[in-house]
């Protein structure tokens, strides 16, 4: 079955709405600052696989704008916008690099650079309150948080790969209306 523009827009709209709801729930429960953006990013996988990076990036941009406007927790919204929301698309593009070491160096450089950018933006917008919160338990705790963040990112990368394979091998066959 040929994919019409209406079908593409409908799927993107549904997954975009679900992404925003996940971000809102993460903010409301105040436990999903990092988990909710990762879950929302996973919803790009079907769009990326079915319609390509153009539609996936349009979905990401739409969810990003809506999250900044609607999600009350700025850190959560920024984490989606700058750190993890686009990652499934970036991961697919980086898969073209033959060297595994170079690929991982780029992935971690992008993740850490984007994370630093988020906190610099939060510092610029919220003032020293964010810095005081980060340094409240000392520099050692900040280093431990950065290490935990990198471990979480590595797990997220593994999850994106596993979910992409699961979608292609199992879900795609069950969701015949997408293709």
Predicted ranges, named:
Residues 81-120:
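Short helix-perturbing small/polar motifs within transmembrane alpha-helices
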Residues 4-5, 139-179:
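Alpha-helical transmembrane segments and their cytosolic interface
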Residues 124-138:
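Membrane-interface helix termini and inter-helical loops of multi-pass transporters
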Residues 40, 59, 63-67, 83-84, ...:
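Transmembrane alpha-helical core residues of multi-pass small-molecule transporters
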Residues 2-55:
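Hydrophobic transmembrane alpha-helices
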Residues 24-33, 64-93:
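Interfacial aromatic-anchored transmembrane helix boundaries in multi-pass membrane proteins
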Residues 73, 108-125, 150-154, 158:
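Mid-bilayer segments of alpha-helical transmembrane spans in multi-pass integral membrane proteins
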Residues 9-14, 35, 57-61, 77-78, ...:
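Hydrophobic alpha-helical transmembrane segments
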């Amino acid at each position: 079955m040929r994919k019409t523009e209406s079908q593409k827009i409908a799927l993107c709209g549904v997954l975009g709405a679900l992404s925003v709801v996940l971000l809102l729930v993460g903010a409301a429960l105040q436990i999903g600052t990092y988990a909710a953006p990762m879950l929302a990013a996973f919803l790009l996988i079907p769009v990326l696989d079915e319609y390509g990076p153009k539609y996936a990036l349009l979905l990401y941009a739409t969810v990003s704008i809506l999250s900044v406007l609607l999600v009350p927790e700025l850190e959560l919204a920024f984490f989606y916008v700058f750190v993890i929301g686009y990652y499934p698309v970036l991961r697919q593009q980086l898969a073209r690099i033959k060297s595994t070491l170079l690929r991982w160096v780029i992935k971690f450089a992008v993740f850490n650079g984007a994370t630093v950018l988020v906190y610099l933006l939060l510092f610029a917008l919220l003032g020293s309150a964010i810095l005081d919160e980060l340094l409240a338990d000392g520099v050692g705790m900040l280093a431990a948080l950065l290490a935990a963040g990198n471990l979480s990112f590595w797990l997220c990368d593994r999850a994106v790969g596993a979910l992409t394979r699961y979608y292609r091998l199992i879900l795609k066959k069950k969701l015949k209306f997408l293709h």
